[in-house]
């Protein structure tokens, strides 16, 4: 993954960017849409290993609260952020968004929404709306599915092989997972009272990110097999290369949604 420990879609501002540069650019792209000002408080829902929190403190001089359900991630992020030279408040909590009830100025969520149960989508949007002040902003970064109508309208053919790969992802990589469509986010935003200011799709950027992850895994094949197994190695290569193909062909997409509380 590199020093950032970013494990979501990178953002390639230049053709010569490496994987880690693309992760920093992705965090900056998301944070830059929030209108952050020094002294604000930013909530990161599903903060991962702390990459976005670190950049938010360093570049935007804000107080940060990260929440995650992973004990390992929370411990790593705390240790990472403790090294920053700042007077701003930094918290990383082992907590779900359902339990968070403090007012914040801005919210960012990168690569967490995909893991939420569909029936909880409206609750999340309502919670975010409630936490923010008037004029507050949320940046939601999520992988997206498409409707059958979208495939027909855009001439995208989905083969039997593609359907089998979808079954593989659902069974072995993200059990029980279901991706939202752009239309779902639009409806959720409207229903909760948000204004959807911008939809920024990054499909090609994720294909490139997945290609780079696969290349890194291939380059360390023997080491990866030694600490896991040949079966796990092959499963992850199938996942990375298959998903890269899906993003290239437009079967799946990924987007950043800028939401404003009026």
Task: List the predicted regions and their residue ranges.
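Conserved class I S-adenosyl-L-methionine
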Residues: 39-46
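Conserved SAM-binding loop
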Residues: 77-78
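Substrate-binding/catalytic lobe of Class I Rossmann-like enzymes that use SAM or dcSAM, i.e.
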Residues: 144-256, 260-262
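A short glycine-rich, Lys/Arg-flanked "PGG" loop and its adjoining helix->strand segment in the class I
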Residues: 122-137
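A short acidic, Gly/Pro-enriched loop at the edge of an enzyme's catalytic core
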Residues: 98-107
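Conserved Class I S-adenosyl-L-methionine-dependent methyltransferase catalytic core
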Residues: 1-33
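Hydrophobic beta-strand segment of the Class I
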Residues: 30, 107-111
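Conserved SAM-binding loop of SAM-dependent methyltransferases across substrates and taxa
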Residues: 49-60
């Amino acid at each position: 993954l590199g020093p950032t420990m970013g494990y979501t879609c990178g953002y390639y501002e230049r053709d010569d960017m490496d994987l880690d540069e693309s992760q920093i650019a992705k965090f900056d792209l998301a944070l830059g849409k929030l209108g952050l000002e020094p002294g604000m408080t930013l909530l990161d829902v599903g903060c991962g290993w702390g990459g976005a929190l670190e950049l938010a403190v360093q570049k935007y001089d804000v107080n940060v609260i990260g929440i995650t359900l992973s004990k390992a991630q929370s411990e790593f992020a705390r240790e990472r952020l403790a090294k920053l030279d700042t007077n701003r408040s930094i918290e990383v909590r082992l907590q779900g968004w359902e339990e968070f009830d403090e007012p914040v100025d801005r919210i960012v969520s990168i690569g967490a929404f995909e893991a939420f149960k569909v029936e909880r989508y409206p609750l999340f949007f309502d919670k975010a709306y409630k936490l923010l002040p008037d004029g507050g902003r949320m940046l939601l970064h999520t992988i997206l599915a498409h409707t059958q109508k979208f495939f027909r309208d855009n001439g995208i053919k989905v083969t039997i092989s593609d359907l089998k790969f979808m079954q593989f992802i659902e069974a072995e990589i993200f059990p029980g997972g279901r991706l939202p469509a752009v239309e779902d986010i639009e409806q959720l935003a409207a229903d909760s009272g948000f204004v959807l200011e911008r939809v920024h799709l990054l499909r090609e950027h994720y294909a490139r990110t997945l290609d780079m992850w696969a290349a890194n895994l291939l380059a360390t094949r023997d080491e990866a097999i030694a600490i896991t197994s040949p079966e796990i190695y092959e499963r992850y290569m199938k996942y990375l290369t298959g998903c890269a193909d899906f993003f290239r062909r437009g079967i799946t997409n990924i987007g950043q949604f800028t939401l404003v509380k009026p």
